[in-house]
């Protein structure tokens, strides 16, 4: 069984009864770096469920994959995951749990958030987090003040503030917790 087939099986076991689509990205250096790279899109069954986009291909090399949770469908997330997968192959130390990533543009149109925090998959737990020796990390959109807060505070301090405020991570312009 190929990595992507095993990967899809892991997603199907987690998101039972959800349609899951597979996408490739054919632009840029990722074609040479990760020729089997794909993004899987988990389609919500209900209006109140998010869209989920999951990278597939870097886990074979770095032992981790990333996912984005979105309030709506957009191909931007496929491009973002391809861009980050490529960058992670060149700068693996910058793509570890607790690090932040500046993606250079809003994570979705009409949002002011241009940074992701590489986080544990809190909305889904350990059942999704592990597939053999591969871990799944959540790319949580954060505000610029939240990113700057991490210069002097721990990720746990920021996560405590998220918990205390009960952030709506699907609100593309949620208030900063800082």
Where are these regions (language model features)?
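Acidic, proline/glycine-rich low-complexity IDRs
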Residues: 1-178
């Amino acid at each position: 069984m190929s990595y992507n087939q095993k990967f899809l099986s892991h997603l199907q076991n987690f998101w039972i009864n959800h349609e899951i689509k597979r996408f490739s990205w054919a632009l840029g250096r990722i074609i040479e770096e990760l020729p089997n790279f794909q993004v899987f899109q988990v389609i919500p069954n209900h209006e109140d469920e998010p869209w989920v986009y999951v990278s597939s291909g870097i886990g074979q090399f770095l032992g981790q994959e990333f996912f984005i949770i979105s309030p709506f469908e957009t191909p931007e997330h496929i491009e973002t995951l391809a861009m980050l997968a490529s960058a992670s192959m060149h700068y693996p130390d910058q793509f570890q749990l607790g690090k932040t990533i500046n993606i250079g543009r809003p994570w979705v149109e009409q949002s002011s958030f241009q940074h992701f925090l590489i986080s544990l998959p809190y909305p889904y737990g350990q059942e999704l987090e592990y597939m053999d020796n591969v871990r799944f990390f959540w790319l949580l959109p954060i505000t610029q003040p939240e990113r700057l807060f991490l210069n002097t505070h721990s990720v746990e301090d920021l996560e405590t503030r998220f918990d205390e405020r009960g952030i709506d991570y699907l609100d593309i312009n949620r208030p900063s917790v800082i």
